[in-house]
Amino acid sequence: MSCPVKRKQKEVKLNFKPKNYETVDAFQKRIEEEAKESKTKEIKQNFKKSHIDKKEFQEVVKEISLSQITRFYSVLEYRNFSTGSDYIEDFLREQVKREETTNDKDLEKAKPFYEYYGKHFLGIDFNKDKTEKKIVTYTKEAILKNEIELSLIKAYVRYCIGKKRLESEGN
């Protein structure tokens, strides 16, 4: 015996959204942003390998005060992070000379950092006098690299200060 079964009809709603197509300009902009992000990541990784992982850098940065690194950061920021100018070299040489002539504790602790930065980032030999002016070339990549590196240095200084405070509270 068979019974007829009535089934409800299923309603299917198709929700078609209009597809947004990416323009050529938008595509190029997106690709440039992705490339910039990968460059930033690469700069950070290279900086970590060449400086942060090395004992010499850790020892130099450990003692500098936050006020000194902030001052140095603002000097570079004022120069738009272009380290190719003589102004930065003059600033570093002045800080090293001031440390030798004054008894400022902050400068005394910052001197090794200034010497390290001058030697490894600018190629300055503090034992020799400055003789010639540099030829300044400004590129977006170099400025971006300098800004990222100095931001990483500043962050590492903050890390060292926080670590010191935690260790002193733990004892």
Say what each PLM segment does.
Residues 1-171:
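Small/polar/charged residue-enriched interaction surfaces, especially the RNA/DNA-contacting tracks
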